[in-house]
Amino acid sequence: MQLSLTQARTWKGLFLLVSCMFLWVYVTATRYDRKSNEEIYDNLLSSSRHIHRVAKKMYKILDSKLTEGVCFRNKNTKMCQTISTHSVKKNEDLLKVIINVSNFWTYPLKMLIPAVLTHLDSDDGMMTRAVELNYGNKVVLEGAKALLSRIQPGIEENNEPDRWSDLRELRSSKKSKHLLAFCKFFYCLRKDTKMVTCYLRALKHGKIKTIC
């Protein structure tokens, strides 16, 4: 039986997502218990830098090829939901910020995959990049939790993050709406992953007073 183009794309997306989930479950189950804090920081920095580069690349592709500069010109795409860091004084405070930021992006990145599959799959490997973002964010989240548990054993986790306010537009069948939603998504993700990378670097080198 020959699959239609839509069916083939759907199966492709499901295969990539399931593969990513199995890899993440295996890696996170074995990664942190045998590693030093420095090794974990190195791993998280690598993952955070990678997802920042991927988000930056996706934003660039979207702005230059799909929206012809609309991303850059539209001020609404640069209004992000931010997390306050004014009370950061200790390592555990900074780790909590990293956890909150990564946790905030967990659901939006999960929903990004079907949205990209529907609207952007044919453009420059966007589907593969969406899966990479989803996986990389989970690596950072679980690693930051592992580090925090070593500093504050038994700490309760925040399992109810705020939801991304533009997910409905991301799924919209109207091209102008979902493209602008993608612009905002990648711009804000790029901004937040840059912040997380900076905080991880500050933690690794013990320079919290000079963070970004």
From Swiss-Prot:
Expressed exclusively in decidua. GO terms for molecular function: hormone activity. Pfam families: Hormone_1. It comes from the Eukaryota. Disulfide bonds join C80-C188. The keyword Secreted applies. Glycans are attached at N100. Keywords: Disulfide bond, Glycoprotein, Hormone, Secreted, Signal. Residues 1-29 form the signal peptide. The keyword Glycoprotein applies. InterPro entries: 4_helix_cytokine-like_core (IPR009079), Somatotropin/Prolactin (IPR001400). It is found in: Secreted. One of its GO terms (cellular component) is extracellular region. Belongs to the somatotropin/prolactin family. This is Prolactin-3C1.
